[in-house]
């Protein structure tokens, strides 16, 4: 086996690993509000999301072409560069998942690839007009649009149903949330799976298996990416689901449906035009907007501020990881460079996973009241069994915002 074929295999495996992390990292985009409002049981929600991500991945390839052709010069691409960019995306995804921050998998991937490209040949190898016009500007516009649409939609929902009893309204909107959340999952699969398709497409063009004039990736690439993102989604990114569903605002069913519908509309529209949009930023913007649009609603601006900070540093920090990885793999060179680079990625991933087990967040405790941070007030054991000191522990620290929705009693039903 020659070194280029070996590198291609490593790149494809790493790309599918990124797609897998994208699935569990971004599950919260679609299902956090439905889980928080009690519209769907947690395990049922992630199952629906996985199926619809799988279906959505087959609906379009416009974003895949953007990733493969519109951000960096395809003639200057090497397999080392693609691998390094993927490492940047995976490491950033795992770090933000550990912290429960819903940052952009899309921007992590793009940042990693651009950083590796700069490390390889300098800034002239990057199509900056493409980065600005198809990544940065759409992200800013989409996030702001999602906030506005989410706020207006929520305000309208509450205005229209003002005279309807709350119990009746909540019941009906929970049913509606099943449809709106499903639409977001479908949109996520349509938008995000394509990004990994685009990376593998780029690698195949670099290797020479696919013509640089090809407009769509091979069918096997589409199928593998669809399966990878669906499998990751089914695991459920509980840490990020908790932040989106409980951390920023307290979600009621009318808010949830308004936020999800707003997100789906923006994401599907962007996918149609081939924009490499961050579904995370759109969904987070919609949730924030729902908090602003609800009469008497509250937003935890500290949590929102941490998210915004993560968004700002995603491109440069993921790019830095991609650049360092490229230097390591390139300087060592050959089989040793590829093996060492891949081994470092595995080691970093395992270390982050072990750290996350110290306080486990899963379907059993994802809807616990937010007490100031992701894991505050949660049981640190794997089984979440009640301890004799749980009562005093929870009462000792008064949470800043206490949930009052009536679905608390059923959140452990799954």
From Swiss-Prot:
The lineage of its organism: Bacteria, Bacillati, Actinomycetota, Actinomycetes, Mycobacteriales. It is found in: Cell membrane. This is Probable low-affinity inorganic phosphate transporter. The keyword Hydrolase does not apply. Residues 381-390 have a biased composition (Basic and acidic residues). It comes from the Bacteria. One of its GO terms (molecular function) is phosphate transmembrane transporter activity. GO terms for biological process: phosphate ion transmembrane transport. Keywords: Cell membrane, Membrane, Phosphate transport, Symport, Transmembrane, Transmembrane helix, Transport. It comes from Mycobacterium leprae (strain TN). It catalyses: phosphate(in) + H(+)(in) = phosphate(out) + H(+)(out). Residues 377-396 are annotated as: Disordered. InterPro entries: Phos_transporter.
